[in-house]
Amino acid sequence: MNSTSTIIEFTGEFWTYFTLVFMMLTIGFFFIVTSLVAAILNKLCDLNDHHTNSLDIRTKLRSDTQLITRAHEESINQSSN
């Protein structure tokens, strides 16, 4: 019985195309990953700004309420004198 084998020769041209395709796939992969990370960070920054702004609004409302209460107390004190 004769044994048959297949010989694959990797010529210089094969390695050139292999390297080119591998490089393109690697660059594409990093581009996709970078885009996803940028989108996630952008979304997180938007959420953080929303919470920061809502906290500022609550703080502003709280200080406005305190100012109104103090003004009301002063008017009561003036009317009682």
Swiss-Prot record:
Channel activity is inhibited by copper. Also inhibited by small-molecule pyronin B. Keywords: Glycoprotein, Host cell membrane, Host endoplasmic reticulum, Host Golgi apparatus, Host membrane, Hydrogen ion transport, Ion transport, Membrane, Phosphoprotein, Signal-anchor, Transmembrane, Transmembrane helix, Transport, Virion. It is found in: Virion membrane; Host cell membrane; Host Golgi apparatus membrane; Host endoplasmic reticulum membrane. Residues 41-81 are virion surface. Coiled coil: none annotated. Residues 1-19 are intravirion. It is a single-pass type II membrane protein. Glycans are attached at residue 77. Its main location: virion. GO terms for cellular component: host cell endoplasmic reticulum membrane; host cell Golgi membrane; host cell plasma membrane; membrane; virion membrane. GO terms for biological process: proton transmembrane transport. The chain crosses the membrane at residues 20-40. Four species of SH have been detected in infected cell cytoplasm: a 7.5 kDa non-glycosylated form (SH0), a 13-15 kDa form that contains one or two N-linked carbohydrate side chains of the high-mannose type (SHg), a 21-30 kDa polylactosaminoglycan-modified form of the protein (SHp), and the isoform generated by alternative translational initiation. Of these different forms, SH0 is by far the most abundant protein detected during virus infection. Tyrosine phosphorylated. Belongs to the orthopneumovirus small hydrophobic protein family. Viroporin that forms a homopentameric ion channel displaying low ion selectivity. May play a role in virus morphogenesis and pathogenicity at various stages of the viral life cycle. Accumulates at the membrane of the Golgi apparatus in infected cells and may facilitate virus release by modifying the secretory pathway. May enhance host membrane permeability and disrupt cellular ion homeostasis, which can be sensed as damage-associated molecular patterns/danger signals, triggering NLRP3 inflammasome activation and inflammatory immune response. Homopentamer forming a funnel-like pore. Interacts with glycoprotein G; this interaction occurs on the surface of virion particles and infected cells. Interacts with host BCAP31 (via C-terminus); this interaction is direct. This is Small hydrophobic protein. It comes from Bovine respiratory syncytial virus (strain 391-2). The lineage of its organism: Viruses, Riboviria, Orthornavirae, Negarnaviricota, Haploviricotina.
